């Protein structure tokens, strides 16, 4: 099950029926038709549970009977598509939800009453996500929430609603409509709180924390590996210089304070500067050992 499906199933499992949620779903997935008996309404979805939710919303909120039809999509995905269809009191339904325009179509914007009411806004965002929302799986590490709209002004209305909840929503116009999106993980988690998907929010945060912990460990390991590589490289340079001194002038001719450091470096090429400092008969600071190693390298360079 994808993360998007899990979020939608959590919302639908709460069995909340809302006029504003229904308004968003119809606005984003509905179409109006005309029959001999008047207007018809069809709402299309690939989610069987959402189709059932719509059926119950029509029945309990408006006492409208509808039917759920389905067919198999013929493209590569071959998903089953559900259509919730009704020809009962469609005009009354659209008028009550402030959805109908004067040309027997659906209004493209969002009603001002929804934009100005927090609870109505929550319900509308919930419906918008159920209809056309998606969240990239947090396991991917690339966080993105999208809500697709047919009309640009509707996408901008969705962005306005999200911004009222202090979410950094942006709108991108595409060839077929527009998309409202969030890209920050914190914004996506807050959105899940807004629509009441608390379990999904907790799951998202858990995955995010695990990923960040793994990344921190990897960075620490990479840094440690790089430090080891630098230590070995510096050690080998010094060892080569000590060998050069030994062959040309003999280590016994080095100043006494350098002889012990030179011997230790040859015996323990993998030691860090701190380990060398701790191993001297008279322990030194790291800077003290570094100073002596630089002296040894300088002597070798002058030979």
UniProtKB/Swiss-Prot annotation:
This is Probable cell division protein WhiA. PANTHER family: CELL DIVISION PROTEIN WHIA-RELATED (PTHR37307:SF1). Residues 272-303 bind DNA. Keywords: Cell cycle, Cell division, DNA-binding. HAMAP family: HTH_type_WhiA. Involved in cell division and chromosome segregation. Pfam families: HTH_WhiA, LAGLIDADG_WhiA, WhiA_N. GO terms for molecular function: DNA binding. It comes from the Bacteria. NCBIfam families: DNA_bind_WhiA. Belongs to the WhiA family. Gene3D superfamilies: Homing endonucleases.
């Amino acid at each position: 099950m994808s993360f998007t499906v899990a979020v939608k199933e959590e919302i639908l499992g709460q069995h909340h029926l809302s006029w504003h949620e229904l308004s968003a779903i119809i606005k984003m997935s509905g179409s109006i038709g005309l029959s001999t008996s008047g207007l018809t309404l069809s709402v299309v979805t690939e989610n069987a549970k959402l189709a059932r939710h719509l059926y119950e919303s029509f029945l309990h909120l408006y006492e409208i009977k509808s039917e759920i039809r389905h067919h198999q999509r013929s493209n590569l995905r071959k998903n089953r598509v559900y259509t919730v269809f009704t020809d009962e009191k469609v005009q009354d339904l659209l008028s009550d939800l402030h959805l109908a325009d004067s040309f027997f179509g659906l209004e493209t914007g969002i009603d001002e009453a929804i934009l100005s009411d927090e609870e109505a806004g929550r319900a509308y965002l919930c419906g918008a996500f159920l209809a056309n929302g998606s969240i990239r799986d947090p396991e991917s590490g690339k966080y993105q929430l999208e809500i697709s709209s047919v009309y640009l002004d509707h996408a901008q209305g969705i962005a306005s609603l999200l911004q009222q909840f202090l979410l950094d929503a942006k709108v991108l116009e595409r060839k077929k409509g527009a998309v409202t999106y969030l890209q920050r993980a914190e914004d996506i988690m807050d959105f899940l709180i807004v629509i009441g998907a608390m379990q999904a929010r907790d799951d998202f945060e858990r995955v995010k924390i695990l990923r960040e912990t793994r990344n921190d460990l990897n960075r620490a390991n990479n840094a440690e590996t790089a430090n080891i590589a630098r230590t070995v490289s510096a050690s080998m340079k010094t060892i080569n210089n000590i060998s050069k001194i030994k062959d040309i002038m003999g280590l016994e001719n080095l100043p006494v304070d350098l002889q012990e450091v030179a011997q230790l470096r040859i015996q323990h090429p993998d030691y860090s500067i701190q380990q060398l400092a701790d191993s001297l008969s008279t322990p030194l600071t790291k800077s003290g050992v570094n100073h002596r190693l630089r002296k040894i390298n300088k002597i070798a360079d002058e030979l």
